[in-house]
Amino acid sequence: MSVATIRAPSSAVTSFVVASRYMPVYLALILLVIVASIWAPAALGSVGLSAIAPYGALLGITALGQMLVIMTGGIDLSVPGTLTMAAVLMVGVSQQSDGRIGVAILTAIGVSALIGLVNGILIGGLKLNALIVTLAVGQVALGAVNRYGRTISVQSPVPTGWSTWVSTRIFGVSPIFWIGAVLTLLLIVAFRYTTVGRRFQAVGANPVASRVVGLRVNLNQIAAYVVAAVLYAIAGLALAGLLRIPGVNSGMPYLLGPIAAVVIGGASLTGGLASPLSTFAAAIFLYGLNHVMRVMGLPTSLQFVVFGLVIIGGMLVSGDRIIKVVERVFRERRRSRRIENETIESSIDGTG
């Protein structure tokens, strides 16, 4: 006589373990709302949320691009150069004419995609170090922006139609937020329901095995940098509309923020696993945290300290670390159940 071994459904366990790596960012968002409602209620007012939505979404769109690169096991430090290039091209190509907005958008996206292609070929094709390559390409882009900036007036604004549209509200929220939400949804659908998306994740998680089964790892890396650069361009164009007169250093604040959002969002820095939704949520959280600290009147020095500690804390409780903790819990539970079942079986056999 035997007793069936009790096991949790493997699919349910796997789903819970994977989902747990993304849980901390949502808990952090809830905690931020609670803290703000107590010590900085003005941050949650209509004016405060109107400030968080567009700039948080800007960081989110940029973080989505960085996420794609990190999923391939790389990193992209050319973000400020690419983003600034797109913003300045909106000014230079449009020449303050609403009729040239479309041409300016296509030009900015095209040039940015070219920057991403250069990154992808050097890293995916020639196997150069991603950190060094993207840093160098970003510097080249910033140099080109400075040179191009001399050909247009320093005080030239973007077309009125563009700045007006970016500053409008759709269902009470900035259109930049809706753009970020749509891009996030598209990536979720791609990863879950398309062959290309599933292969992209598989290649990032295990490039060696992917090569063995015939997947084109190099092409995967190149595509990641190109799509990421297009997302940076979208963020740069939106930033130009918000600033109205973008400068040659407009993209500099977006060097480390997107990386922090990806990390806090639970992505695996070794490649493969990442969630577009948690990455976008992490970006909203980071900008919201900055906004709340400003409303609370914290000194700038203390804001830097808090921001840094939050990033470190996010790395400690999200991603691979929390996965190991959850797996350890399930392992101990399975072990205790196995011992219990063996004990029951032994007692039954003994009485038989």
Protein language model annotation of sequence segments:
Residues 1-30, 34, 212-219, 293-352:
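Cytosolic-side transmembrane-helix boundaries in multi-pass membrane proteins
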Residues 130-193, 220-223, 242-251, 295, ...:
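Transmembrane helix-bundle core of multi-pass membrane transporters
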Residues 28-45, 72, 145-153, 188-195, ...:
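Structural signal for alpha-helical transmembrane segments and their membrane-water exit/capping regions
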Residues 232, 242-308:
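Transmembrane alpha-helical segments in multi-pass inner-membrane proteins
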